[in-house]
Amino acid sequence: MGKSQRDKGNRNERQLVNIFRAYGIDAKRVPLSGAASGFKGDIIAIIDGQDWRIESKVRGNGFKQIYGWLDGNDALVVKADRQQALIVMPLRRFCELVGEVET
C-alpha cells in the first residue's frame, strides 16, 4: 500500500472517530490499524459497554454497486453463498441507533 493510500485511510479513521464521538460513542483508533498490536480492526467503539472492532475501507469508486442498492433505503442486507448476511447502512443512521446525540 502506498503512502497516499495509508494517509487516506488514516484520515478516514480519524473522521470516523470524530463522528462517533459527536454521537456520544466512545471510540478510538487502533494503533497501526491493529497490525502490530494483534488487534483486529481500525477502530474500537464502546457500544452498550462492549468493544466493537470496526474495520474501515475507503475506495474511490469501489463501492458504487452497494451505494446504488442502498439508495433510498435505510439499510441493505447482502449475503454471499455459505456466508453470514451483512447489513450496510449510512454511518449517521447507525450512530443514531446506537449513540446519544450531544446537545
Please give the residue ranges for each predicted region.
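Catalytic phosphate/metal-binding cores of nucleic-acid and nucleotide-processing enzymes, i.e., regions
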Residues: 1-103
